[in-house]
Amino acid sequence: DSGTIRLNEIDITNFEAEDRGIGLIFQRPVLYPHLSVSGNLSLASKSGHEEALEEVGLSGFEGRAVENLSGGEGQRVALARALLAEPDVLLLDEPFSALDSDLSVRLLKDVRQLLKKRKCPAILVTHNQQEAEMFSDRILEMSD
């Protein structure tokens, strides 16, 4: 319960979550099942949905019910929503671990390419060394 969170040399410890400039992607997509894909994206931004979905490979998904999405599609919607908020940094907490290995590798490569294109720094938390090596420019290993 002590310490500070600094981003771009600014202490953001006491900022409201939505004002910190940090995007989050979790192991399982955090989406609102009663909302459409577009409804979920509206939580981050009222516009830019078509472009965001195109960037993550989901063109035409705006009206789909999130409950009918596959795991990979759900992660892509979560990514689109996080990026619509234009975060200063994106935190990814085991985002590929619930996906099968082929889909995981494909999504990992797509996310890496998209983040590089947007010049958005990211921190990936993973237990998978190969995943870390494929995704990262630098790796920090934590233990105990």
Regions flagged by a language model, labelled:
Residues 4-27:
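ABC ATPase NBD coupling module
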Residues 48-61, 67, 112-116:
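Conserved ABC ATPase "signature" region
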Residues 65-69, 73-75:
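Conserved ABC ATPase signature
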Residues 79:
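Hydrophobic anchor residue at the start of the ABC signature
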Residues 86:
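Conserved catalytic motifs of ABC-family nucleotide-binding domains
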Residues 90-94:
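Catalytic Walker B motif of ABC-type/P-loop ATPase nucleotide-binding domains
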Residues 119-125:
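Conserved H-loop
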